Design a protein with these regions (language model features):
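Bacterial Sec-dependent signal peptides at the C-terminal "C-region" and cleavage site
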Residues: 12-30
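A short beta-strand motif characteristic of beta-propeller blades
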Residues: 33-39, 75-81, 116-123, 165-171, ...
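Beta-rich, blade/repeat-based domains predominating
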Residues: 40-54, 83-100, 124-140, 169-187, ...
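A short loop-to-beta-strand structural motif that recurs across blades of beta-propeller domains
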Residues: 66-68, 104-106, 155-158, 197-199, ...
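Hydrophobic alpha-helical segments and helix pairs
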Residues: 114-171
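Short loop/turn segments immediately following beta-strands, especially the blade-tip
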Residues: 201-209, 309-314
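Blade-level signature of beta-propeller repeat domains, shared across WD40, Kelch, NHL, RCC1
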Residues: 274-328
Length: 328
């Protein structure tokens, strides 16, 4: 598997880099330590997103088929179990969310547990499943699929509107991940994990059309692969890197590495800003892909971590609601 093979190389190089620094630019890179926010053993923790109305962090364990709601003040989690993999969660109202299950998009009521299908997703006869997703500033869900063999390029990035209309936006994808929008709403940043870089697309807020605008970031060799992603108010990209022991912060305009959040787990999967002032970075991790020896060496794998990195994030967009942040 792509991620498993890359992990061995990435872990070796990441440990070496941690020991010797970052070469000529090491003094310019800020290092921040993450701490455990919630101790658990998620097989594939993913999809971290803050719910401002509830003051909680939502996230999923894809292989555990479970949606979680972490309440920071109580240090406790609520959970909801599903009969299929649950891969993405975005807020809709103060009590409903929209979820990507492995082969469909549904509305889910956190109070009543009522489920309503919005649209099915083409999984090519089970060769694909849904993966990461987020809502655009105009309230449309952008969600991608991934190839279960992590090799073929059959997957697609879709745009799902509240009406149920679904459009294919990017084809030829292997593992769709980490989509965010710039503060001026004119650009999308997007990861197809095995490529090892972050793509930039020109974005039309009104039509939803996108045009490839180049590579924003080439992930440094040996630091893992780009997974989930968040963006701060200064348009810096905070990228969870599978096999990279951390979240890496890049300048979206220059591609320069600015900071690294050190996480004591190899497989870092997603991140999201949250908290009352949107200044806490929450981070999910995974136990999947690790050998028994690696799990013994990194026993906190699967936990949710957090830190205050000195940056402020932007609130998430809600499904079906247009962002009140003004286009520049």
């Amino acid at each position: 598997m792509i991620r498993a093979c890359k992990l061995i190389q990435a872990m070796t190089v990441a440990l070496l880099l941690a020991a010797i620094g970052w070469g000529t630019s090491c003094s310019e890179v800020k290092h921040i330590n993450a701490e455990v926010a919630y101790q658990t053993e998620a097989q594939l923790g993913e999809g971290a997103i803050w719910h401002p109305d509830r003051g909680t962090l939502l996230w999923v364990d894809i292989e555990g088929r479970t949606l979680y709601e972490f309440m920071p003040e109580k240090k406790k989690c609520r959970s909801w179990k599903f009969d299929r993999r649950v891969t993405t969660v975005v807020p809709e109202t103060d009590h409903t969310v929209v979820l990507a299950l492995e082969n469909s998009i549904i509305r889910f009521d956190l109070n009543t547990r009522e489920k309503t299908e919005i649209t099915p997703i083409d999984t090519k006869g089970g060769r694909l499943r849904c993966n990461d997703g987020k809502c655009s500033p105009n309230g449309w869900l952008w969600v991608g699929t991934m190839s279960l063999d992590e090799k073929s390029s059959e997957a697609t990035l879709y745009c799902v509107r509240p009406t149920g209309r679904i459009d294919a936006m990017v084809r030829g994808v292997t593992i769709s991940n980490g989509i965010v929008w710039s503060s001026n709403k004119k650009y999308i940043y997007y990861n197809d994990t095995p490529t090892g870089h972050i793509r930039r697309f020109r974005y039309n807020l009104h039509s939803g059309d996108i045009i490839m605008n180049g590579i924003a970031v080439d992930i440094p060799e040996g630091t893992g692969l780009p997974d989930g992603m968040a963006i701060d108010r200064n348009d810096n990209l905070w990228v969870a890197q599978w096999g990279g022991f951390g979240v890496y912060c890049y300048n979206a305009y220059t591609g320069e590495l600015i900071a690294k959040v050190e996480v004591p787990a190899p497989n870092v999967t997603s991140c999201a800003f949250g908290g009352e002032h949107m200044d806490v970075l929450y981070i999910t991790t995974a136990r999947e892909g690790l050998t028994p020896d690696e799990l013994a060496a990194y026993p906190l794998s699967g936990c949710v971590f957090s830190c205050r990195p000195g940056a402020v994030g932007v609130p998430p967009n809600y499904f079906g609601q247009e962002s009140n942040q003004q286009e520049e």
